[in-house]
Amino acid sequence: MRDSKKYVVKIPNFYLVKTVTGVEEWAVATHFEPVQARYALPCFDEPAIRAKFNFKVTVPNELTSLCCMEVTDKSVDGANTTYSYATTPSMSTYLLAVCCGKYDFVEGSTKSGIKVRIYANRGEGMGFNFCEPPTLGSRD
């Protein structure tokens, strides 16, 4: 896709997340398999047909945007932050992943230097100590 049109995503993937403290907050996440990618972008929803994708996501400053690729640029313009992501490898549309919400993260590296981040809903990072050691060790 080589245009810069803005698409309004009209797919049923807006979730009301209840935090551990009982607060309800909205989070947005894609769930394109098996054939829902066509509701978000013009494409052939066929696993054998692949393409490379570039994502740029703008969210209010209090939210974090995550994508299936690494952030290449992050810019703040007033009340909004725009995240730009690296180009994906050639892939099927159902593998695309983007989510936005209030998240915290911890970051570490494997012994071989691969950067790993673990995300949780903001304020719910108590599980980080449980999942970080096995996650970082799983790639070495």
Describe the predicted segments one by one.
Residues 1-140:
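Acidic/His-enriched low-complexity segments
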